[in-house]
């Protein structure tokens, strides 16, 4: 590390240890249109019809494995629950702006809690066959006024490895639908232009239980807990996280300003609240729950994921609250972070302290105005009114029901 960078970091470190408690209690409203969008109330701007499906598509999966409720893909479950009691729900499909199919394609977990996406395409096809056979609404647009929550690693490509996900592409039957997904990366086959990118699920009540007094100084400069190498799937570290996590470890494992480890302590949430910067590098996918945790706990997210599309980017000013570091620049991470002026850091912290910012990243029970549920509805409302071109002529078809891998065509 350069001497200048080291001295700058130490000065920052000491400054924040002494003064961050006083500064962090201040908040700053998001300026301009972004702040207005974040605080929009979607009620009255759209009506959603929720299809009633057999429980094998949703509730029975959850009964079989309740772990799905706490998994980072749980948005598919909580969005269903939210819509059932939301004032935007209509029981008259003829007046609906949007149609929602409540299925839980990621609620199929291994004994270690990892999702198995391999049955998801068949489940999705089965549900679409069901709604297209029993209601007329799918057939009139072939899904263009329907939305699906697909929170898996690579969304509706339904594979956890990027190479395989790219090979598969988005499920053909979803080509016209709006996808609500955690995956977001520019110019990627698994992100449709009209998709709504959302945060992964992080348990609000669990995080709430770990809040510490706001006057505790932020005495950690850079914080990260997680894998640097996926020893089972990529022991050399060149493919996992495109080598970015391995580069963090190799360059900064002995740097006293970097509190990084594979250990996951019981004080993880408390530690994030004591840190100035929290690393949010890509893993197998560009996103992770660390992004949510950093925002909720007021730790400036350091986003290391080239071309990432972040949640609710039209409402949350990510450039103002976070720090973006190119994957190739990871070896310069210490210099980059220690070069950020103090006043810039303080402003980012004030923005992060805004309650509306935190609410937008969470799926609380019960729902709250401005939370992630409402941001999704805002995204759907901004797509209205639908263009007349989405409606097909009698007998017209746009989708190929026989396209896709042979395994996907088997009954579910």
Swiss-Prot record:
This is Probable beta-1,4-xylosyltransferase IRX10. Its main location: Golgi. The chain crosses the membrane at residues 1-21. It comes from Arabidopsis thaliana. Glycans are attached at residues 139, 400. The lineage of its organism: Eukaryota, Viridiplantae, Streptophyta, Embryophyta, Tracheophyta. It is found in: Golgi apparatus membrane. The keyword NADP does not apply. The keyword Cell wall biogenesis/degradation applies. Belongs to the glycosyltransferase 47 family. It is a single-pass type II membrane protein. GO terms for biological process: cell wall organization; glucuronoxylan biosynthetic process; plant-type secondary cell wall biogenesis; protein glycosylation.
